[in-house]
Amino acid sequence: MLQSPSSPYPRTITLIGMMGVGKSTIGRRLASQLNMPFSDSDLEIEEAAGQSITEIFARYGENYFRNGERRVISRLIAGEPKVLAVGGGAFMDEETRKLVLEKTLAIWVKADIDTLAERVTKQADRPLLIGHDVRTRLQELADIRDSFYAMAPLHVWTGAQPHEEIVDAIIMALPR
């Protein structure tokens, strides 16, 4: 594990990527190593709405959710620098994507489809996967999203390696 920097990173670091890639887990560890606060936009949305994301999708639909997501992410970015994990679809919204790319350091956290499928099948709370073959649906989403995620200036692969190694790789790649 790398020595923690003496001061936090001066900008918000936003972790983007597919569901199940580990943005929240890696984000918490990265924030700890950088002496920064951590926020997860999905958790912030659930807290603000008093409902789970699955419930929001079921009651109001994806467009309603994305509008709320945009507002929450905008508020989080406007605050103090932090490590921010955003939902897999957040970066598909043009306004959110522009804000993330202009105001934060975006890092695309990547994993292969088989790894993602293995991780998300353990979780029942993924509204975009309900009623679908998980691997097929993840591939469809990746086919749509990857070209947008690729706009992030930093990319990091995840897989079987320990989260500490991924965090160390991110810290070493941070522009200073």
From Swiss-Prot:
UniProt entry tagged with the keyword ATP-binding: yes
Record bears the keyword ATP-binding: yes
GO MF assignments: ATP binding; magnesium ion binding; shikimate kinase activity
Catalytic activity: shikimate + ATP = 3-phosphoshikimate + ADP + H(+)
A GO cellular component entry from the record: cytosol
InterPro entries: P-loop_NTPase (IPR027417), Shikimate/glucono_kinase (IPR031322), Shikimate_kinase/TSH1 (IPR000623), Shikimate_kinase_CS (IPR023000)
Record keywords: Amino-acid biosynthesis, Aromatic amino acid biosynthesis, ATP-binding, Cytoplasm, Kinase, Nucleotide-binding, Transferase
HAMAP family: Shikimate_kinase (MF_00109)
Record protein name field: Shikimate kinase
Originating species: Zymomonas mobilis subsp. mobilis (strain ATCC 31821 / ZM4 / CP4)
Gene for this chain: aroK
